[in-house]
Amino acid sequence: MENDRADKEVAEMSKIKVNEQRAVDEFQELTAIDAPSFGERQMADRLIVKLKELGFEVEEDNAGKHFGGNAGNLYAYLPGDLPGDPVLLSGHMDTVEPSKGKKGIIGENGVIRSAGKAVLGADDVAGLV
């Protein structure tokens, strides 16, 4: 019985269309934000705006103050009424070094890569999109 429900949920999810251009634009926007460890404020502020636009309730703790950072952890909740267990997604906002001046370029094959020597989304920033 549980497998039948899971099969139906997967079938419904397969109907969802991904807006590839929106995903690329979001990726480019977020990876352009400099967010080194302990300096994630700009990333946190941008994510708070985006999450609220999507209907999430957003909270921020004060963990940054305890560890010398300028942003806390973000918790975003999206109330729902679908059957099944809640889903938890987790990521981090800081980027690996070198991260200053990141810029992505899109190759002919559609692969986004760094335009220079800075790391581009090779950490959880790619997962924030």
Predicted regions and their residues:
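A non-catalytic alpha/beta surface segment that caps or lines the substrate-entry region
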Residues: 36-83
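Active-site metal-coordination/substrate-binding segment of hydrolases
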Residues: 70, 77-79, 83-129
